[in-house]
Amino acid sequence: FTDLKFRVVLSPRSSKKIYEKGIESIPSESVCYPAKLSHGHIESLIEKGIKYIFYPSVAYERKENVTQGNHYNCPVVTSYPEVIRNNVDNLETNEIIFRNPFMDLSNRKTMFTNLKDEFKSFGISDKELKAAIEHAYEELQQCRLDIQGEGETVLAYLKENNMTGVVLSGRPYHVDPEINHGLADLITGEGMAVLTEDSVCHLDKELEELRVVDQWTYHSRMYHAASFVSSQPNLQLIQLTSFGCGLDAVTADQVAEILNARNKIYTLIKIDEGSNLGAIRIRIRSLKATIDKQENKEIDLSKKYKPVKVPFTKEMKDDRWTILCPQMSPIHFQFVEKAMQESGYNLKVLPSVDKGATEAGLKYVNNDACYPSI
């Protein structure tokens, strides 16, 4: 934007006051705290007199390693600009130009096409726009390299001084002090260094396969960070999740499995707008005490994480093994059973969900999982 001669104005740092500014337009109490905060940030920009707000819907991140099946953003990150557009009345009242184009950070051609359409009223030439996009990607890459370099510097310091480090693993917005409530300070206060998952995930060379589908860029960072931590005797991992995040119900179980393969401690901390850290402080001190007890314990590097999957073989198909299919949509699934049977699979769609099915599901599914999973 600076290259294109725009004056860039950012909203203030997140705070409880910012959160309260937007509380009236939040449509769902169950959405995560970072999403709730965005309402306050938009209201803050409106109060500053900003007449043009750019809040893109980023559906795809960049693919950061070859093991990823895809590179989506979470549905909330992808679609929340639409929620803002339809719920923040002050955008219309103050005649704000609100732009939220859907963008794919992994495809520079579509980035150019979308931004050209977005900025056509500003008279920006194709040459100027292409140069600005290239510069932006260069800055993004340099930022990634800077973070990775800092991570490697901290790791070298820990090894040299025989210290313990904690990888505070989460999503990019968990770096926001208002969202993490100063959790990193609690950890350093116990004499341990803090690293982020994206400062070490590039160092993992072991993780090849997962139990879950690896199609989210930020999830992939967590998995590779966990794999790297599992191979380092002086590192531990704490996963940070926001209340209401259904996707992290998946990552929490997978990260725990990766760490447990080498008997590493898995610590999960859930946070929301509440800033009382008493219980969290106790958990960190307990982690520190456990680490001290295991100080001289060696890691068996021969124990690599291998997901347990049940294959469906051609022999099973030929022997007419039954495939049970949960009822997800009565309108569509009435055709699924017949279509699969015509294709040679003995598939049975389960009956519609009742109270008993829900209660049974709750016994086996992560508490944060969405209702269809249960």
Please provide the spans of the model-predicted regions.
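An N-terminal assembly and electron-transfer interface module characteristic of large anaerobic redox
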Residues: 2-374
